[in-house]
Amino acid sequence: MFFAEIKQEEVIVGGFRIGQGFDVHQLVEGRKLVIGGVTIPYEKGLLGHSDADVLLHAICDAVLGAAALGDIGRHFSDTDPRYRNIDSRVLLQNVGNLLAERGYRVVNVDATIIAQAPRMASHIPAMVANIAQDLRMQPGDVNVKAKTAERLGPVGRGEGIEAEAVCLITHMNQTTD
């Protein structure tokens, strides 16, 4: 059978979808550093309209992308005063609600924070717990890693922090077994 002859229902086996997200923000003085919903002691914070949580923003984009719902800017514009300094956990919870309204749930999240400093390892368990809670998942279905940029580029020079995320979603009536 040629691909053109396959019906749409046959193409979407199991109803699984993959999403990918990315975010980057500049480090500046005078702001607190919030990553994964965790306030991290550091002399600089991330610049942005919201709390500039790069990790949660990347996850929001991954989840929205998997559901073909655009990106974080489409739903939470950085020109809308309602989102000024908003806790990005609220945004992630809202993204989870949008997903559920369309009959999907997140199966797993895998994310990477890229920062020359500060060290993230001791904060990762709290980040994982926040993400799992906000997306109504088990912590064992969330993975967060931290890497340096090996002193290369703007992130390596300590000018900013990046995050990347991928996720798998499925219809709530589907099982992953």
Swiss-Prot record:
Question: How is the cofactor bound here?
Answer: Binds 1 divalent metal cation per subunit.
List cofactor names only.
Answer: a divalent metal cation
**Catalyzed reactions:** 4-CDP-2-C-methyl-D-erythritol 2-phosphate = 2-C-methyl-D-erythritol 2,4-cyclic diphosphate + CMP
In the UniProt record, does the keyword Ribosomal protein occur?
A: no
Q: Which UniProt keywords apply?
A: Isoprene biosynthesis, Lyase, Metal-binding
| Sites where the protein binds a divalent metal cation | D23, H25, H57
Q: Which GO terms describe its biological process?
A: isopentenyl diphosphate biosynthetic process, methylerythritol 4-phosphate pathway; terpenoid biosynthetic process
User: Enzyme group, top EC level?
Assistant: lyase
Task: Cite the position(s) of the site with description Transition state stabilizer.
Answer: H49, T148
Gene Ontology MF terms in the entry: 2-C-methyl-D-erythritol 2,4-cyclodiphosphate synthase activity; metal ion binding
Family listed? Belongs to the IspF family.
Supply the HAMAP family for this chain: IspF
Q: Which PANTHER family match?
A: 2-C-METHYL-D-ERYTHRITOL 2,4-CYCLODIPHOSPHATE SYNTHASE, CHLOROPLASTIC
Q: What is this protein called?
A: 2-C-methyl-D-erythritol 2,4-cyclodiphosphate synthase
Q: Which organism is it from?
A: Nitrosospira multiformis (strain ATCC 25196 / NCIMB 11849 / C 71)
